[in-house]
Amino acid sequence: MLATFQLDGQEFMALNGGPNHKFSEAVSLFVDCETQAEVDELWAKFTEGGEEGPCGWLKDKYGLSWQIVPSALGQLMNDTDPVRAQRVMNAMLQMKKIDITMLQQAYDQP
């Protein structure tokens, strides 16, 4: 069975490969979030019946992998100061759901 659908104006096509083809992390959907509230809301909805993973990854109740990532992560990690960027990376590696305040605290360390 083939299905097409739109999310936020972007068209997607999905093919049912049958019971022998399971979802894996080889395919994931990336959601760029502007605020912590958006991260929190999506994380709560998608992990209900699903499972949390490391570094902003999760699986929804259907087994589809998602990356729920605040825009701030890219902004902080792309800093020209490699020490600051590495501190942000190290903080993120300790997280499941990404926390913007904790990233900012790692970035701001003297």
Predicted features, each with a name:
Residues M1-P110:
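Glyoxalase I/VOC metalloenzyme domain signal
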